[in-house]
Amino acid sequence: MTPTNTAIATALFSQLTAAALGYPIAWPGTDFMPPATGVWLEPMVMPNTGIDNGLAATDTTIPQGIFQVGVFDRPGRGVLAVNRAADDVKASFLKNATITGLVRVQRNPYSFEIQPDADRLSVIVTIPYTG
């Protein structure tokens, strides 16, 4: 059976929790106050249109999407801490790792820095998945 987007999101969030990286996590839809100092994470699952695996209405659809984890820090400490934390997140989602059922990490995770805001430095980790 093809996992639902909710099942995939649950598995991704569980895997991030199980990695026990030591950073506070702002889960989607929950109240969260970012720390005054130090790194924190903000995960978001973005399902994409599935790949139809045939022409019949009963054929399966292959799920795909991206899991992004925003890695944030307060300015003043430089970019090394936030990039180290991004590397920790990437190391927790290796290429071909099982997410749930047949859903796997599709490619090596990658990250990029976003223009800093007045109150935060940002690195976004992208983890593509397909199943």
PLM features per residue range, with description:
Residues 1-59, 77-80, 84-91, 96-100:
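Small/polar-rich, solvent-exposed N-terminal microdomains that initiate assembly or binding
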Residues 34, 60, 114-118:
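Sterically constrained small-residue positions within well-ordered secondary structures
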Residues 13, 38, 65-67, 118-120:
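A generic structural signal for ordered secondary structure
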Residues 22-23, 87-131:
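Acidic-leaning, charged glycine-interspersed low-complexity segments
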Residues 59-76, 121-131:
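Oligomerization/assembly interface segments of phage tail-like spikes and tubes
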